Amino acid sequence: MITLTELKCLADAQSSYHILKPWWDVFWYYITLIMLLVAVLAGALQLTQSRVLCCLPCKVEFDNHCAVPWDILKASMNTSSNPGTPLPLPLRIQNDLHRQQYSYIDAVCYEKQLHWFAKFFPYLVLLHTLIFAACSNFWLHYPSTSSRLEHFVAILHKCFDSPWTTRALSETVAEQSVRPLKLSKSKILLSSSGCSADIDSGKQSLPYPQPGLESAGIESPTSSVLDKKEGEQAKAIFEKVKRFRMHVEQKDIIYRVYLKQIIVKVILFVLIITYVPYFLTHITLEIDCSVDVQAFTGYKRYQCVYSLAEIFKVLASFYVILVILYGLTSSYSLWWMLRSSLKQYSFEALREKSNYSDIPDVKNDFAFILHLADQYDPLYSKRFSIFLSEVSENKLKQINLNNEWTVEKLKSKLVKNAQDKIELHLFMLNGLPDNVFELTEMEVLSLELIPEVKLPSAVSQLVNLKELRVYHSSLVVDHPALAFLEENLKILRLKFTEMGKIPRWVFHLKNLKELYLSGCVLPEQLSTMQLEGFQDLKNLRTLYLKSSLSRIPQVVTDLLPSLQKLSLDNEGSKLVVLNNLKKMVNLKSLELISCDLERIPHSIFSLNNLHELDLRENNLKTVEEIISFQHLQNLSCLKLWHNNIAYIPAQIGALSNLEQLSLDHNNIENLPLQLFLCTKLHYLDLSYNHLTFIPEEIQYLSNLQYFAVTNNNIEMLPDGLFQCKKLQCLLLGKNSLMNLSPHVGELSNLTHLELIGNYLETLPPELEGCQSLKRNCLIVEENLLNTLPLPVTERLQTCLDKC
């Protein structure tokens, strides 16, 4: 038995698809119901009424039909020429039949003589109706289509009822009404404000378009803020729409099934119109029934009446009219499907009217479903389109983001960075919370892995902002925000996500002093940039490029001659052309990192103002060119670390002004005595080499403050090392030292001592003389500390927290 609950669920399931049924589907539905009533009525009449009444047996049969005796006599007289021929007379047989005999004759005549169309007419109507109904509803129950349709209907109802839909539509209406007023006000402001006028004129003077620069958005006064629950619900709808679109747009199975349904209906319509009118003529009231039952009843032919003939003719005619209406509608729907491009759906008209100009066009089954929904009510597709717009989604994300990131939560994220600046680091968010602009004390804003960031005019509230870091994020800057950054931003760090894509707004930062660009920036793209862009960076002093280049971009050497520091990390790719370095005469610091250099480039020796040179992580094996550094009178810092240098040439002594020398992570085995002619050295790092001893002449480095020989093979320290009275940091770890000279106590300025990883058995008690050395800055095995006298240990421990 089917319960009422099951019937109710079935009815609800059918009614949920009403938005996908055009007017012809509704028309078919009602015609099908009428056809079904015709079938039921005809069937009921056939079952309840007497089928065939045969109450007049034929007593005289003449010329293969029933006749009265007088007709036979007259015919015989006209045809017979012999008057003596006897007339045939009917047999004298009992003609009063029993009721059961009449019933028998009725049944036999119904089965043998009544035309099949008259007998099966109700069943044919029922069969046709069921086929029509099946064709109309097959796509709603076929698994491959019904699942998609159910998903679409469920999402569509949520889109229709979502508060976000109402908010977006009302916002569109409000913006359209407010836009003319805003435009007139903006003209007045631009004409009265000198700063704004300068910005506007600057924009007009740009000879190229400005991607990434957008006008400030107009805030709708009528827009209401969603609560957290409504925001999460709208966010879930956006995700469902994305997944549904991705799934449905791949195929056109719904379109093909619906089209085949209509084709079957048209074929069935043609078939019915062909045979039903023809067989309708075979339904007659009177039936001449000839059956071979004379032995049982005494008669062979009977005159019968089919009592349902007239009403069946009426019902059949009415049924034909219904089929014609059904067929014409099916033909129209077939023509509509073949004429229209139902696999493409464009929101162009909606994009022109609304402020969501990014609503994408859809295709295949998604487009077809929307076309069907438009036949029911175009408002459904309009509301649905809001959840296809990325602009709409971004606005929702912004609202949810603001609800999540309150001012208190953002303040808890403020930290002091290594440069002692107040920094806010936002990582993997959906956008930039509006409450960020309430943190006026912030000096550094770091944005990492944020897909879409927009800096509005509210950034001008961050009066202390001097540094901006954008790592693997897409940043769009409004014009008012750009005006603020032009005046206040000093340091900009960018890590690119897309190859060679440098935002154009970077070249408007006229007060920028340091620019860090990290990513796959191709030299061709750099050289083809608008020259005016780099020329505007007149205050730029530091440029850092991390990329894979074959040469230093010409735009850097030609348009930034006043650059003081250039750092290039080539990520292991070979840097071939370096001749254009000669143009950068004002360069004070040069870093060529991971450039696969095998020799020191000669173009460096032309940089007379160079103070610092860093060539780390290259493939340098020899540095014979070091003699040429004597022409660089200002060179004070030389870093040749992380290379394959086997020896230090004796010409190193010519660098009398050298103050810092880094040769760690090489293959150096010996130190030339000329090295100790660089008496201004205060920093010397020889860690991770193959040194076995340190010359006694190290005592001439009287200004030495930092000395590192970690991870070598040194067995003994020269006494001259302890003559470097200014030594503050001494790193001797991971060597082969057997003992530590008592002269270590003479290093009164020593603050950091590393001895771990040697073969020491005891520590000299003279360590007590290192008054600046603290326990936490003495890196040694714990058991060696126990060899020190207790007063020395206690003194080291008392100042543990001050190191």
Curated annotation (Swiss-Prot):
Q: What is its main location?
A: membrane
Residues annotated as transmembrane: 26-46, 120-140, 262-282, 308-328
Question: Which residues are exposed on the Cytoplasmic face of the membrane?
Answer: 1-25, 141-261, 329-803
* Repeat positions for LRR: 464-486, 488-509, 511-532, 539-559, 562-582, 586-607, 609-630, 634-655, 657-678, 680-701, 703-724, 726-747, 749-771
Glycan attachment positions? 78
Location relative to the cell? Cell membrane; Endoplasmic reticulum membrane
What Gene3D superfamilies does the record point to?
Ribonuclease Inhibitor
Q: Which family does it belong to?
A: Belongs to the LRRC8 family.
Task: Please give the name of this protein.
Answer: Volume-regulated anion channel subunit LRRC8B
